[in-house]
Amino acid sequence: MRRIRIRLHAVALGAGACALATFIGGCRQSTPATEPISSGRVVDLGHALSETDPTWDGKPAFSRQTVATIARDGYFGETFSTEEHFNTHVDAPAHFAANGATVDRLAPDRLVHAAVCINIAAEAARDEDYRLTRADIERFEAAHGRISAGTIVLVATGWDARWPDPARYMNEKNGKKHFPGLTAEAAALLAKDRRVAAIGIDTASIDFGPSEQFEAHHASMPEGAYHIENATGLTALPPTGFTVIVAPIKIKDGSGGPTRVFALLPERQ
């Protein structure tokens, strides 16, 4: 995957991002599998950015420099440089589709929406190259209802437990990475047939590690689906009954960018 770097100023921005608390897109056409909620507890599904995080090619992708301190300047600020596709991030459709939407053109109602979580952690524990299949999705729908258009679909593999150790997370052996993902058929079913807004996963890519052609990317991005990669905490989510909020950096004409991701869960869960 190509390395795309952005540089941003973080001087005196402060820590308070605006809360997207109650706007839920597509509520009126939800099914039991994708029933949104508008209040409850909020769970963070993203990693904090740091210089030691795993990277696709093993090379540094994030750096920062302090430019102001409270002792010297009366306020604290930094500059930082990062790749678009680093840490918990969004792949906009334009990343693999020539006419796809760039990250700044992702519609807000596709970033805040009812979600489902398909858990394949048991399969991934047995097979590090396991891929979510069409049959897995159909079994999920048989149990929880059909996935409706606009849904954010998260795939929980448990791979994020390896995040603190970049070598184990990227899991490269004999020149090939090994981690779970989706088959191209499963990605196409979600993006083309179910018309989901997004596919998210707790690994470095929705394609499994050994992929060299990124078949799942090519099967889903021309259909308008964006991806969330390097998420965390997905195995703790329920299959249905929650909302996801995705807030990527809004880079003009960008192919993606680091993102905050939150799940809004009912208080009882």
Region annotations inferred by a language model:
Residues 2-4, 20, 29-32:
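A detector of low-complexity, intrinsically disordered, Ser/Thr/Gly/Pro/Ala-rich segments
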Residues 2-13:
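Bacterial N-terminal signal peptides that target proteins for export
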Residues 5-7, 25, 38:
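Residues marking helix boundaries in flexible regions
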